A protein has these predicted regions:
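Extracytoplasmic/periplasmic solute-binding protein
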Residues: 84-88, 93, 117-167, 174, ...
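A bilobed periplasmic-binding-protein/Venus flytrap-type ligand-binding module shared by bacterial periplasmic
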Residues: 96-99, 246-259
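Short, solvent-exposed loop/beta-turn-alpha elements that line the ligand-binding surface or hinge
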Residues: 57-71, 75, 111, 134-142, ...
Length: 360
C-alpha cells in the first residue's frame, strides 16, 4: 500500500485491521448501509451473495496472473463464469497418521490408497489399541464439519453445485456413497463425533487418542514433539481420485465507492508476485501460485508439501451459495443424520439437495 501511494500521488490508502471473526459481517453490513469499504479480505464463500446483491465488482484478473494460479483455484471465486475476488489465501488437506499407534495395532504405517484400506486400518487401531480410536471425525455444528465431508466427496468424484451453470448436483451416487462411508467411519472414530470440530481433533491426535485425521498444512506445527507422524494423500473413494477440498479467502473490490479503479489495481498488486509469495510462506499455506514459474521453489519442494500440492488437480472448490450459512446448516444436518444413523443416506442426500435449491 505504501509503494502504491508513492507511485500514485494524491491517492491515500487507509488500512484497517479487523478481527477475522467479525471482518466479513462488518464489510457486508457497511455495503448494505451504502457506505462500502474500497476492498476487503473475505472468505471466498461470501462472494456469490455479495455479487448477487451488486455489492462487489467482477475482478479483472490479468491473463498472465490467471495462468499463474494452481489448477482449480479460480473455481473458488467463480460464479456463472465470472470471477468475483482475487484469491489470496489457500489451503488443501492431507491425512496425518500416528505411526506408533498404527504399528501397535499391527498395521504398516503406509498411506491408505482407498477408503476400504483406510477403514480397515482405523478398525485395527480401534480393536487392538486400548483407549485409542482409528480416526478423528468432525460432526459438530461448525463449518469444518462440512469441509471434512467435502474432502471425502471430492475424493469420490462428487460435487455440490456446478459453478458455471449454478445447478445443484449434490444428489448423485457419489454423494450417497460418501455419506454412507462418513457415517460408517463413526464406528472407528472417537466417541460422540457430534461434539468435535477439526481443531479439537488435533488435540486428540496429540493425546494419542486417534491414529489418523485430516488437516491442513499448518497441522505439522501443531503436533507435539516426539510423535512419529506421517503425512499422506486423502484416500480415493470407489468413484474418484485422491482429492481434497480447495478453500480460498480472497480480496473483493466493492462497488459504489468512487475509487473502484484504484482499489482494483491495488488488490491485484497485493495478491500477486512477491507480495503473495511472502504471505503464503509466512502463514504456512498451500501455495496459491505455481511459484517455480517465477523462480521461487522453496519451501514447496519438500515431500511434506507435495502431499498438499499434488492433490490440487483432483480437488474441488468450496461451493458458493448466496446464503452460505444456510448451505452449511443443510450440509451439516445431512452429515449428522448419517453419523447418528437417522435415515437412509439416499434420502438424506435427496432432502439436502432439495433444500439447497433455496439458497443457491
Amino acid at each position: 500500500a505504501d509503494k502504491y501511494m508513492e507511485d500514485n500521488p494524491g491517492v491515500t490508502v487507509t488500512l484497517e485491521a479487523v478481527p477475522w471473526g467479525t471482518c466479513q459481517d462488518k464489510v457486508i453490513n457497511l455495503a448494505i448501509a451504502g457506505d462500502p469499504v474500497a476492498f476487503s479480505y473475505v472468505g471466498s464463500r461470501t462472494l456469490k451473495g455479495l455479487a448477487e446483491n451488486g455489492h462487489i465488482l467482477e475482478t479483472n484478473i490479468p491473463a498472465s496472473q490467471k495462468a499463474m494460479y494452481q489448477p482449480g483455484i479460480l473455481n473458488t471465486v467463480t460464479h456463472m463464469g465470472k470471477t468475483w475476488g482475487f484469491p489470496h489465501a489457500f489451503s488443501t488437506k492431507a491425512l496425518f497418521m500416528n505411526c506408533g499407534l498404527l504399528e501397535k495395532a499391527g498395521v504398516a504405517c503406509e498411506g491408505p490408497q482407498t477408503w476400504d484400506e483406510l477403514y480397515s486400518m482405523a478398525e485395527a487401531v480401534t480393536k487392538n489399541v486400548d483407549g485409542a480410536a482409528g480416526i478423528g471425525l468432525a460432526g459438530k455444528d461448525f463449518d469444518n464439519t462440512m469441509h471434512q465431508f467435502l474432502n471425502y466427496l471430492y475424493s469420490n468424484g462428487g460435487q455440490v453445485i456446478d459453478p458455471m451453470t449454478n445447478e445443484i448436483t449434490l444428489n448423485s451416487s457419489n454423494t450417497v456413497e460418501t455419506l454412507e462411508f462418513y457415517g460408517k467411519l463413526a464406528n472407528v472414530a472417537q466417541e460422540g463425533p457430534l461434539a468435535w470440530e477439526r481443531s479439537q481433533l488435533t488435540e486428540l491426535f496429540n493425546d494419542e487418542k486417534i491414529a489418523m485425521y485430516i488437516n491442513g498444512p499448518w497441522g505439522r506445527g501443531q503436533h507435539k514433539e516426539g510423535l512419529d507422524v506421517k503425512t499422506v494423500r486423502i484416500p480415493a473413494g470407489p468413484q474418484g481420485n485422491q482429492g481434497t477440498l480447495l478453500i480460498t479467502d480472497s480480496v473483493a473490490v466493492f462497488s459504489n465507492t468512487g475509487v473502484e479503479k484504484e482499489a482494483m489495481e491495488l488488490a491485484s498488486i497485493i495478491t500477486s508476485g512477491d507480495s503473495q509469495y511472502s504471505l503464503d510462506t509466512d502463514w504456512g499455506l498451500t501455495p496459491i501460485m505455481q511459484y517455480p514459474q517465477i523462480g521461487n521453489e522453496a519451501p514447496y519442494n519438500e515431500d511434506y508439501w507435495m502431499m498438499f500440492i499434488d492433490a490440487i488437480g483432483d480437488g474441488g472448490p468450496e461451493p458458493l451459495f448466496v446464503d452460505y450459512k444456510a448451505f452449511q446448516t443443510v450440509m451439516n444436518s445431512m452429515i449428522q443424520g448419517a453419523i447418528l444413523g437417522e435415515g437412509d443416506a439416499a434420502d438424506l442426500v435427496a432432502e439436502a439437495a432439495e433444500e439447497l435449491e433455496e439458497y443457491k
